[in-house]
């Protein structure tokens, strides 16, 4: 078994264990002396001891019995800490973790310090050393949020030109659906006044002209991001892989998802796998536009090859609710810059027939498909087209997934239940953008975002996720938002939609394993399953729910 030690702060814990020999050298390890929470069953179950043999759990039960059967095993005293199944994020973009870990940190507080455009510019300037620029050839940063910036607007190329006119610059919006590029970058990308808006995207313009102002939306932005942010050398590639994996492991991940893999991100992960660089399991969902070729390779498989596999297809039907590109049936109360009154957002794929064809291909080939849909109009389109395909092919044994569903209506949850759809919801929004949602869609609907309790009560299978690098891949904050639903201003966003801490943990362990067809090997602590474990400094079921966000991952074992 390989042990991945995340923080130097845990050295004290390790050296205080009862045995003097490092368990790194032992095949059998007996864990005891803490809360060992199996996550097996509808109510919490604890065991006194757990024994692993290399990468497999071989015993869960009483400490007396464990010591008798496994007398030669090295013992690991947990000293009151909490041992759980390794975390499985139901939706994230692992290929973007390195950029988040390495790039300029332009997230707003509490995650970083970009609370106005001046501070954003300073952070970018401070980051712009020759060594950093050399990694990709660009100055780049991840996570600016116009809804939190004092100016309540997007930065433009004019703002970024204050950082540099010599080097190209790209900053990624916190939603991952927009970017801003400086003048040098626009020229390198050949985006100018004659460049048309792509279908499903928008190049924002300087008012009363066709000149790009630097802001790119949706399909004007998303295809170019991985090209710009890709490492430019073998040394840079190695630095990216180390940074991305260390970030995931530091938050307790043992399985991570690349939730919309383009060819470049698939090649990045394929290279990592083939060079035996991956330490945790990575499952990719390939963008529908290139799925037909990549899902016919050996990487599309039920089991991992060097910790990597393709799990299915990703379809995106609209954009970002906080960025106001999610496709709605009711107008936004505050349209984005340049939009007219009555603005509804817009579809990524306007034609129902085109969407139906994508679903039909997935069903015909027995490919799992994950569908990004945030606005209720996008979910109407999803339901309309899926109904037709399901009538033709059936859905027995399928585990197709709604990703985000931020503005889902109750009647749509009923429809998803009938279509056997798993709902992977995104309650991080309640903290990061709960106040903003209420501004742009109103109090009544704003309190219904990420309706986890309603979905669960209606009998849907649910999971929750980080969507990192949209936010940091901090699964303790995901648990905290799912159980508290408190906004930045301290307001409760939909009290009746709260999950219990145990339900929230289920969403990132057993239920997420089920979503990925991996429930036979992951998600609970049972004999025969993988020894994917995470050690926490406190038990999420025993602390006050407001303190869940402060729990620290001490160790991730894969």
Language-model segment annotations:
Residues 4-12:
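Sec-dependent N-terminal signal peptides
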Residues 15-16:
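C-terminal motif of bacterial Sec signal peptides marking the signal peptidase cleavage site
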Residues 19, 62, 538:
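Short, conserved catalytic or interaction motifs in soluble domains
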Residues 22-32, 37, 41-296, 302, ...:
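Divalent metal-binding segments
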Residues 93, 307-325, 420-431:
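Non-cysteine beta-strand/loop elements that form the S-adenosyl-L-methionine
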Residues 273-276, 299-308, 393-395, 416-418:
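Acidic (Asp/Glu)-rich catalytic clusters
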Residues 360-370, 377-400, 404-405, 410-418, ...:
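His/Asp/Glu-enriched, well-ordered alpha-helical/loop segment
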């Amino acid at each position: 078994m390989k042990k991945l030690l995340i923080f130097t702060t845990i050295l004290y814990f390790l050296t205080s264990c009862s045995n003097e020999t490092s368990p790194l050298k032992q095949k059998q390890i007996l864990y005891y002396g803490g809360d060992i929470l199996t996550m097996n069953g509808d109510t919490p179950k604890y065991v006194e001891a757990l024994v692993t043999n290399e990468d497999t759990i071989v015993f869960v039960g009483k400490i007396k019995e464990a010591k008798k059967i496994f007398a030669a095993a090295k013992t690991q005293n947990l000293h009151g800490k909490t041992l759980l199944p390794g975390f499985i994020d139901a939706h994230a973009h692992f290929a973007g973790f390195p950029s988040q870990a390495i790039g300029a940190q332009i997230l707003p507080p509490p995650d970083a310090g970009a609370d106005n455009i001046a501070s954003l510019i300073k952070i970018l300037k401070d980051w712009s050393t020759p060594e950093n620029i050399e990694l990709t050839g660009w100055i780049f940063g991840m996570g600016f949020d116009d809804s939190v910036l004092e100016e309540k607007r997007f930065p433009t190329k004019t703002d970024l030109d204050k950082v540099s006119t010599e080097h190209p610059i790209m900053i990624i919006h916190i939603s991952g659906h927009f970017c801003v590029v400086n003048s040098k970058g626009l020229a390198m990308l050949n985006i100018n006044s004659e460049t048309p808006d792509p279908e499903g995207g928008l190049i924002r313009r300087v008012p009363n002209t066709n000149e790009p102002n630097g802001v790119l939306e949706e399909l004007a932005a998303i295809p170019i991001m991985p090209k710009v942010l890709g490492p430019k050398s073998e040394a840079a590639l190695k630095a990216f892989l180390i940074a991305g994996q260390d970030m995931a492991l530091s938050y307790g991940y043992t399985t991570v998802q690349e939730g919309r893999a383009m060819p470049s991100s698939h090649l990045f992960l394929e290279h990592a796998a083939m060079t035996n660089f991956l330490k945790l399991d990575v499952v990719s969902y390939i963008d529908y536009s290139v799925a037909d070729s990549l899902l016919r390779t050996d990487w599309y498989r039920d089991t991992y090859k060097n910790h990597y596999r393709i799990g299915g297809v990703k379809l995106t039907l609209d954009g970002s609710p906080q960025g106001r590109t999610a496709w709605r049936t009711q107008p936004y109360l505050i349209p984005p810059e340049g939009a007219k009154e009555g603005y509804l957002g817009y579809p990524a794929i306007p034609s129902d027939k085109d969407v139906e064809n994508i679903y039909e291909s997935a069903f015909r080939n027995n490919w799992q498909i994950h569908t990004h849909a945030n606005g209720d109009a996008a979910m109407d389109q999803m339901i309309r087209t899926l109904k037709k395909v399901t009538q033709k092919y059936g859905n027995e044994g399928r585990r197709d997934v709604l990703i985000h569903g931020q503005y889902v209506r109750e009647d749509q949850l009923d429809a998803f239940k009938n279509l056997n759809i798993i709902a992977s919801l995104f309650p991080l929004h309640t903290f990061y953008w709960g106040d903003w949602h209420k501004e742009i869609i109103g109090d009544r609907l704003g309190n219904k975002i990420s309706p986890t309790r309603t979905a669960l009560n209606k009998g849907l299978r649910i999971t929750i996720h980080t969507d990192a690098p949209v936010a940091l891949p901090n699964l303790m904050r995901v648990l905290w938002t799912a159980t508290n639903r408190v906004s930045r201003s301290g307001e409760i966003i939909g009290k009746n939609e709260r999950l219990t801490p145990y339900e929230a943990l289920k969403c990132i362990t057993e239920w997420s394993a089920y979503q990925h067809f991996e429930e036979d090997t992951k998600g609970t602590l049972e004999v025969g399953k993988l020894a994917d474990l995470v050690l926490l400094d406190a038990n999420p079921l025993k602390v006050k729910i407001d303190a869940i966000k402060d729990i620290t991952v001490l160790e991730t074992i894969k």
